[in-house]
């Protein structure tokens, strides 16, 4: 999917910190809606400083670069650019082999041969996600780091995690831009406008919307002040039920994918602290869908029906990077 700089403002995340692909939290490149008109990157020049992370499996690379060095600022500005090979589109793949495709032989033995095939321009796009200007937090976020599992009690959350989160400058203005139709209004698949129990459903930027195998949408609630799973009580059950039922119905209507082919879940810890729910194709191993982070929405609803304070009391397990100050806070508090 060829996103403009305004659209790219929306990964994440996502993504999940353990994720190898960007998600709806890549929002830092501007505000606005997409266009098919030719566009330019929101900066001039790009001098690679460091490869932050790469994955041959996922065919993705994260680059830190200096930009705008010719604008009078001798030091330039920091930017992160994420390059990702896009999935094949089944309806177009035959075009790669018709006519006289440009090929370079790599290997041949009996009936087996391997080539490098150089596709035409319209079939060789690379998804490019831009984070600009990028802060030190962004550079650390995209750098590969070791992870550790930690168990957080309800008391840990109230005394350590919540104060730590409140001390951080975690802007979610991009979320409000979507909810207020200031950005990406044309990408909204479905909306329940109720200010308390409504939400918008929008494709995650990790999904190019060209095939259903990696379908990925996000439901973002209109109601403000619900940070995460830990805040949920029976008061929020109407909202959660609406997201589950209406989200599945909207996806069935738009994409002909039934609810039993969807994984519908919340992250804990989330990538950003405004309640949102992930809808992914069941066969897609989406970043952050592992047992240490994903909580199925249907089970969240049932837990709240059985115990109104379930998520205030329950011990939750999740992964943190080894350089995350929150990990050190929790580990120190849990030392015997």
From Swiss-Prot:
UniProt keyword Phosphoprotein, yes or no: yes
Activation and inhibition: The hydrolytic product 7-methylguanosine diphosphate (m7GDP) efficiently inhibits the decapping scavenger activity and acts as a competitive inhibitor in vitro. Inhibited by 2,4-diaminoquinazoline.
Modified sites of kind N6-acetyllysine: 137, 141
Chain positions with N-acetylalanine modification: 2
GO cellular component: cytoplasm; nucleus; P-body
Disordered, as annotated region: 1-36
Locus of motif nuclear export sequence (NES): 141-153
EC number per UniProt: 3.6.1.59
Record-linked Gene3D superfamilies: HIT-like (3.30.428.10), Scavenger mRNA decapping enzyme, N-terminal domain (3.30.200.40)
Keyword line: Acetylation, Cytoplasm, Hydrolase, mRNA processing, mRNA splicing, Nucleus, Phosphoprotein
PROSITE patterns (alphabetical): HIT_1 (PS00892)
A Pfam family reported for this protein in Swiss-Prot or TrEMBL: DcpS
Catalytic residues of the enzyme: 276 (nucleophile)
Family: Belongs to the HIT family.
Subunit structure: Homodimer. Associates with components of the exosome multienzyme ribonuclease complex, such as EXOSC3 and EXOSC4. Interacts with NDOR1.
Protein name, as recorded: m7GpppX diphosphatase
Organism of derivation: Rattus norvegicus
């Amino acid at each position: 999917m060829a996103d403009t700089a305004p659209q790219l403002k929306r990964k994440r995340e996502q993504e999940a910190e353990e994720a190898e692909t960007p998600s709806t939290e890549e929002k830092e490149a501007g505000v606005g809606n997409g266009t098919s008109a030719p566009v330019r990157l929101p900066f001039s020049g790009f001098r690679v400083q460091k490869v932050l992370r790469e994955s041959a499996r996922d065919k993705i690379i994260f680059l830190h670069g200096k930009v705008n060095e010719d604008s009078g600022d001798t030091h330039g500005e920091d930017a992160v650019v994420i390059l990702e090979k896009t999935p094949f589109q089944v309806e177009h793949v035959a075009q790669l082999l018709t006519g006289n495709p440009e090929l370079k032989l790599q290997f041949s033995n009996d009936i087996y041969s391997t080539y490098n095939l150089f596709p035409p321009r319209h079939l060789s796009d690379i998804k490019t996600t831009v984070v600009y200007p990028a802060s030190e937090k962004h550079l650390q976020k995209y750098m590969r780091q070791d992870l550790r599992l930690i168990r957080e009690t309800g008391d840990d959350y109230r005394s350590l995690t919540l104060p730590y989160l409140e001390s951080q400058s975690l802007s979610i203005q991009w979320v409000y831009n979507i909810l207020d139709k200031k950005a990406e209004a044309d990408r909204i698949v479905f909306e329940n406008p109720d200010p308390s129990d409504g939400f918008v459903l929008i494709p995650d930027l990790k999904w190019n919307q060209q095939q259903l195998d990696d379908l990925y949408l996000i439901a973002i609630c209109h109601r403000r002040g619900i940070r995460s799973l830990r805040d949920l009580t029976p008061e929020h059950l109407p909202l959660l039920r609406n997201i589950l039922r209406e989200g599945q119905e909207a996806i069935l209507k738009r994409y002909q994918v039934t609810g039993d082919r969807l994984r519908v879940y919340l992250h804990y810890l989330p990538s950003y602290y405004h309640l949102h729910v992930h809808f992914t194709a069941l066969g897609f191993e989406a970043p952050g869908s592992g047992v240490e982070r994903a909580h199925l929405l249907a089970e969240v609803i049932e837990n709240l029906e059985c115990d109104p304070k379930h998520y205030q009391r329950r011990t939750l397990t999740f992964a943190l990077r080894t350089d995350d100050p929150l990990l050190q806070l929790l580990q120190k508090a849990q030392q015997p």
